[in-house]
Amino acid sequence: TLAAEFGKHPAVQLWHLSNEYSGDCFCPLCQQAFRDWLRVRYGSLEALNHAWWSHFWSHTITDWSQIDPRDSSVDGMRLDWLRFVTHQTVDFMRAEIAALREGG
C-alpha cells in the first residue's frame, strides 16, 4: 500500500487523509453516541440543564432519552451537537492516522 511504501519516508511531511466531510447523521447510533458524550461531558442532567439554561425556555431535560439533536430550539444542545460532530471527526482522523503509521 501507499502507507507501507511512503508512510515513514523522510520527505513526506503531510498526508491527505480524506475530504468532503459534511452533513449530520441522526441515526439511532449517532443519537445515542451524542447522549453518551453528553453524560461524560456534564455528568448529570442537572449540570446539563444548567449549562444549556434549558429551564429558562421550559425545555428542562428529565431523562437522557429526551435529548434529540435534531431539535434546534435549544441553543446549548445545538452547540454541543456541533462540538460532538467535531469530536467524532477528529476521532475518525486519528484512527486513519494510526492506520497509516502502522502501515508505514
Protein language model features and the residues they cover:
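Polysaccharide-binding and catalytic clefts of secreted carbohydrate-active enzymes
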Residues: 1-104
